[in-house]
Amino acid sequence: MQAARGGAGRPGREGRGLERECERSPGVGAAMPPGPCAWPPRAALRLWLGCVCFALVQADSPSAPVNVTVRHLKANSAVVSWDVLEDEVVIGFAISQQKKDVRMLRFIQEVNTTTRSCALWDLEEDTEYIVHVQAISIQGQSPASEPVLFKTPREAEKMASKNKDEVTMKEMGRNQQLRTGEVLIIVVVLFMWAGVIALFCRQYDIIKDNEPNNNKEKTKSASETSTPEHQGGGLLRSKI
């Protein structure tokens, strides 16, 4: 029983010894290996510093582009455009393009500080695509923008819409020509009426000016055809 008690008591003493070692600070000249309560290893310290640096870089990285839209959509091409915040200083942009439900990714990098659009080519007709845009600065890349989903039209649909546009343009041209012809006809008729009215007024003025002369001539002729005068100045008397 004593042996059992003694054996059971030894581990307790050893445990208390370890606790005392943890409480004591190592001596100046001690060459003992670090105990259970030693300082963290260098790997953990490096990991912590790396996390801090990564957080600082993320804080200085630009914001994600905004107002990402797809325009000039065709069967085999499209144009993606975006905007950035006014205070952001960027040196380029990265565009990620992929098909919907497909992991294949196309990466396009634009090293231009003024561009706000990028052309997408070699697209497949009647296919859905997803586009992301990232801003690039000296500190790194920004988070990806909101995904934009678009679908390319079919070539037949594009041709049909193009034909409709052409027909509409032709109809507009014809209507414009008809309107121009109608306006010309109206102008010509108005000029003709103006000429007729001017000619009538002129003839009326001429006729009105000639009326007094005609009246004088009629009066003179009437006086001449009245009773003739005698040569001596008296009137001739009829003989009974």
Swiss-Prot record:
The record marks R106 as: Required for dimerization. GO terms for biological process: positive regulation of brown fat cell differentiation; response to muscle activity. Coiled coil: none annotated. PANTHER family: FIBRONECTIN TYPE III DOMAIN-CONTAINING PROTEIN, FIBRONECTIN TYPE III DOMAIN-CONTAINING PROTEIN 5. Residues 1-10, 231-240 have a biased composition (Gly residues). Glycans are attached at N67, N112. GO terms for cellular component: endoplasmic reticulum; extracellular region; peroxisomal membrane; plasma membrane. Fibronectin type-III domain is capable of forming a continuous intersubunit beta-sheet dimer; dimerization may thereby play a role in cell-cell adhesion or signaling. GO terms for molecular function: hormone activity. Residues 11-24, 210-221 have a biased composition (Basic and acidic residues). The keyword Cell membrane applies. InterPro entries: FN3_dom, FN3_sf, FNDC_type_III_4/5, Ig-like_fold. Keywords: Cell membrane, Glycoprotein, Hormone, Membrane, Peroxisome, Secreted, Transmembrane, Transmembrane helix. SUPFAM superfamilies: Fibronectin type III. The chain crosses the membrane at residues 181-201. N-Glycosylated. This is Fibronectin type III domain-containing protein 5. Residues 1-30, 210-240 are annotated as: Disordered. Residues 64-155 form the Fibronectin type-III domain. It holds the Pfam family fn3. The keyword Glycoprotein applies. A motif (Microbody targeting signal) lies at residues 238-240.
